């Protein structure tokens, strides 16, 4: 995951044409300086590739990532775009409304911990409290990485809390009364979009936790300390002999293995464990946020099932009503047909018989009523109505 300090000229020329960007430089003492420089100046300062800065461009849809280089950690965590070295932090777009709190947190945390490491007071009198004797000896890059991860995890947790506060009442209103207004409230929740954002952070942290060698690449201070190790002397002796390209590649891989082996012994292993605990803590935090979103999604699915059940029940009632109306219409049509026939002004022998018309009409009405009861009874028997 490391690169040489040399910069590719083609990438430099590409970066040089880019306009200047605002950066906030925060050193190990917590002092901040606003920089307005182009990408080439940043590349020369921290020795990274131009493609590492392209992921910061808002016009490019780049995935969330944590990258390590020879002397820098490049973080692209949504709106938090930061480059961390062993002694300074470069924060992109510090005037963004979402980045301003992060910049202040960097200044506060790094400045406070620097004063604690020196045993200096904060400038404010504590109520009889003394500075702990056991100071935080974590490397600068670990403390800066902790601030960045805590910022993105807290940001997503806050968005999740806001979604819960608006989501559960909206779902309850929709369950109690199905309407376009309540449905519009639920449609604006955007649970899936936030879940994808949280899942990306979790996947990135999980990817780093799966390999201890990758965790060792985050120890920038140890990398700098090992540059003057005895391994460098052996490298000079090896490089003094001419080698073929194939043998040179093998020697290069062997040297990389030696350097990697030297950085995971002794105190380096402690640094690996420390950064692993750091990532695990934020992994658990982002996992809790993802669980909250999963619970909200499950509640949404349950509400959707309940609404579908209510709609199906209403649809069944309409079908039952339609069956009853159809049966009644058939019976009334038969009755109207008989009455219409008897009402025609045609000479007929029954016209001379008194009360014959009333008997026929009454009998027809009775038969139609019996026919209607038979239809409804059959529909109930077939469980078409009355369920």
Curated annotation (Swiss-Prot):
One of its GO terms (biological process) is magnesium ion transport. The keyword Ion transport applies. One of its GO terms (molecular function) is magnesium ion transmembrane transporter activity. Keywords: Ion transport, Magnesium, Membrane, Transmembrane, Transmembrane helix, Transport. Gene3D superfamilies: 2.40.128.330, Magnesium transport protein CorA, transmembrane region. CDD domains: Mrs2_Mfm1p-like. Residues 113-127 have a biased composition (Basic and acidic residues). It is found in: Membrane. One of its GO terms (cellular component) is membrane. It is a multi-pass membrane protein. It comes from the Eukaryota. Residues 113-137 are annotated as: Disordered. The chain crosses the membrane at residues 323-343, 359-379. It holds the Pfam family MRS2-like. Belongs to the CorA metal ion transporter (MIT) (TC 1.A.35.5) family. Putative magnesium transporter. This is Putative magnesium transporter MRS2-9. It comes from Arabidopsis thaliana. The gene is MRS2-9.
């Amino acid at each position: 995951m490391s690169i040489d300090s040399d910069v590719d000229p083609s990438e430099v020329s590409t970066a040089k044409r880019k306009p200047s960007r605002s950066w906030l430089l925060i050193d190990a003492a917590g002092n901040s300086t606003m920089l307005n420089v182009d990408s080439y100046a940043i590349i020369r300062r921290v020795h990274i590739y131009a493609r590492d800065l392209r992921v910061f461009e808002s016009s490019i849809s780049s995935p969330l990532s944590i990258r390590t280089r020879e002397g820098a950690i490049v973080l692209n965590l949504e709106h938090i775009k930061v480059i961390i070295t062993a002694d300074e932090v470069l924060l992109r777009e510090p005037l963004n409304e979402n980045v301003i709190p992060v910049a202040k947190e960097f200044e506060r945390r790094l400045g406070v911990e620097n004063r604690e490491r020196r045993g200096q007071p904060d400038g404010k009198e504590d109520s009889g409290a003394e500075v702990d004797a056991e100071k935080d000896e974590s490397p600068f890059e670990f403390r800066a990485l902790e601030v960045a991860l805590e910022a993105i995890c807290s940001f997503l947790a806050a968005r999740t809390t806001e979604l819960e506060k608006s989501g559960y009442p909206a779902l309850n209103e929709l369950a109690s009364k199905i309407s376009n207004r309540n449905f519009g409230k639920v449609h604006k929740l955007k649970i899936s979009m936030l879940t994808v954002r949280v899942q990306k952070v979790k996947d990135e942290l999980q990817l780093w936790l799966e390999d201890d060698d990758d965790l060792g690449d985050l120890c920038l201070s140890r990398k700098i300390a090992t540059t003057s190790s005895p391994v460098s002397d052996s490298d000079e002796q090896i490089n003094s002999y001419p080698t073929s390209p194939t043998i040179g590649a093998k020697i290069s891989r062997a040297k990389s293995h030696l350097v990697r082996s030297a950085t995971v012994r002794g105190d380096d292993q402690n640094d690996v464990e420390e950064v692993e605990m750091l990532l695990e803590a934020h992994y658990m935090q982002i996992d809790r946020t993802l669980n909250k979103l999963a619970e909200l999604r499950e509640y949404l699915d349950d509400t959707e099932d309940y609404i579908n059940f209510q709609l199906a029940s209403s649809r069944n009632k309409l079908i039952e009503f339609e069956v009853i109306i159809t049966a009644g219409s058939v019976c009334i049509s038969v009755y109207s047909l008989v009455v219409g026939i008897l009402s025609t002004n045609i000479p007929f022998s029954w016209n001379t018989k008194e009360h014959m018309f009333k008997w026929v009409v009454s009998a027809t009405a009775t038969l139609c009523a019996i026919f209607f009861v038979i239809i409804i009874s059959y529909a109930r028997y077939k469980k078409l109505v009355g369920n």
